[in-house]
């Protein structure tokens, strides 16, 4: 094992060079076998970001009344979940849900988030989801999620401490009848959300939306920020005014809950040499009913019908490409 340090200099006055540790190991063979383990149960954190402006009362009620459809998926898959709700209001406000100085991005409700052991969890979620209609008419759902998943919210015992788990999947669900008006461009928020799990864990994070955009043949017209974020982060998007809420909650649950499907290789692989086994059984290379290799991310992804089951051992054998 060899170690070293990169020293990165810059032209910012008063800024010292940045030192980056480097660790590497030489090998004398191109034969490689990577072994992965599927979790015994999925860990998922779900953050609902709900518009609390004056026109949202009916949609909040629909969200609350259809939560049972959503949570049934989690129960059937034996998911270890955290589910919390915040509003799109990131301004200082005195009304519901910002009563008592609730900071922007702070989880709503006396029970901040629900888990499988929360008593009467359906009733608790229904209470938390009714975030009120006296919030700002300048809806900033992406900014609210950014604040909710950043210090000081993540370290505040009165707000979000304990909700976010670094080793869990993260799914965000934005619900609004107006376009997002957050101050930063979409790529700022997408990059931040992805950074929470790292580039090698892209399948651990999703964003979905029930929003104002009109979608025709997969193309958005009108207010498209929530649609674009959902598209870039491989989630579900539905128009809020044409939504069959029960079906939409089922679709979002199917995207949010589940086992890991993507596994990153330790060395750059020669694609033709790849062989994949799950619990000792060979799985064929087939994007529809097996696995496929992505040379850009150097990862193996399983199709929906071939996901490794709970506790499974995944073995990937291949010849590594010698890099200059």
Describe the predicted segments one by one:
Residues 1-32:
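Feature for long, exposed domains in two main contexts
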Residues 1-5, 163, 311:
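Short glycine/proline/serine/threonine-rich loop/turn segments at secondary-structure transition edges
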Residues 295-303:
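Extracellular adhesion/glycan-binding regions together with long Ser/Thr-
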Residues 302-310:
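Surface-exposed, short loops/turns at beta-strand junctions within beta-sandwich domains
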